[in-house]
Amino acid sequence: MCKHNQIQTGIKSDVINEIIKLAKKFDVHKVILFGSRARGNFQEKSDIDLAVSGGEWGMFRLAVEEETSTLLKFDVVNLDKCASNELLAVIEREGIVLYEKIW
């Protein structure tokens, strides 16, 4: 996994900062960007795929959809539940860590 680069992902820094702020607010442990935006082969209207672990996952998901300054849609996956081995492998291979809580 690597760090965020606006050119690579097409996501404005303001939106990333809003995601990080919400992750802290809802005590999320880790937020990983994956999918076409992490791979760099996204289209202008591609959604933003996020994998999240820890914290108030449901509240974080709702807040990201409602409170970020983008019209792009979000697909938020809870890593603590129901993530298939195939999806976990994709996230591990292509994921970009946007936020990780320091203990």
Regions from the PLM with identified roles:
Residues 1-30, 38-44, 53-103:
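Catalytic core of pol beta-like nucleotidyltransferases
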